[in-house]
């Protein structure tokens, strides 16, 4: 684990950055699994846990009281980092991450909207 990506370190990093007149911007993500393209990289897998991983990463970010939060997500469906609308799909033995168990195709967009609203409330 990298120090800056470890959630428990985010309050300290935020404080340190402020002392240096700099910014620490924590980055949250929905999960990660790239073993389909990098089979040796299983130690970096972060299961989504029906949205709990994403929500917990947001809560950790909000607890640090940063000036901004970034969302690490892209259309890297093979890495499971997407938050856009998703429906179940298989390609051979590979099953793409979808949100049917978590709450539907828009689950992560709605969760992002809720967490951004919480972040906005903390800023004012």
Describe the function of each predicted region.
Residues 1-124:
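Glycan-processing catalytic domains of CAZymes
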């Amino acid at each position: 684990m990298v120090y800056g990506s470890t959630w428990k370190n985010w309050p300290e990093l935020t404080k340190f950055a402020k002392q240096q007149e700099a910014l620490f911007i924590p980055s949250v993500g929905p999960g990660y699994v790239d073993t389909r393209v990098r089979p040796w990289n299983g130690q970096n897998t972060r299961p989504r846990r029906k949205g709990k991983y994403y929500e917990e990463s947001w809560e950790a970010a909000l607890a640090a009281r940063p000036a901004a939060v970034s969302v690490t997500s892209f259309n890297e469906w093979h890495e499971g980092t997407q938050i856009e609308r998703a429906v179940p799909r298989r390609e051979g033995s590979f099953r793409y991450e979808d949100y049917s168990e978590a709450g539907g195709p828009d689950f992560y967009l709605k969760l992002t909207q809720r967490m951004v609203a919480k972040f906005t409330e903390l800023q004012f």
